[in-house]
């Protein structure tokens, strides 16, 4: 019975991956290269902003620790 459970789990994951791959390929066909370029530019700006905010968060946290220690 245990092997049947593993088999059905594998089939379910395989079906899910196949379905996700199909929809991903459909998305790739609908977006033009110029749209992908715009998505890339916007994505890089978003990741840059997230990096800046993460750095700012940790710098503030570090400053609070230094102030608590009296440095």
UniProtKB/Swiss-Prot annotation:
InterPro entries from the UniProt entry: Lysis_S
Domain of life where this protein originates: Bacteria
The keyword Mitochondrion is assigned to this record: no
Biological-process GO terms, alphabetical: viral release from host cell by cytolysis
Keywords linked to the UniProt accession: Cytolysis, Host cell lysis by virus, Viral release from host cell
Pfam families xref list: Phage_holin_2_1 (PF04971)
Alphabetized GO MF terms: pore-forming activity
Additional remarks: Encoded by the cryptic lambdoid prophage DLP12.
Family: Belongs to the lambda phage S protein family.
Name listed for the protein in its UniProt record: Prophage lysis protein S homolog EssD
Organism name: Escherichia coli (strain K12)
């Amino acid at each position: 019975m245990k092997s049947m459970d593993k088999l059905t789990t594998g089939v379910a994951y395989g079906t899910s991956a196949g379905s996700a791959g199909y929809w991903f390929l459909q998305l790739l066909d609908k977006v033009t290269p110029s749209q992908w370029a715009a998505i890339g530019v916007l994505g890089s700006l978003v990741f840059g902003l997230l990096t800046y905010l993460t750095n700012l968060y940790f710098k503030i946290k570090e400053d609070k620790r230094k102030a608590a220690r009296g440095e």
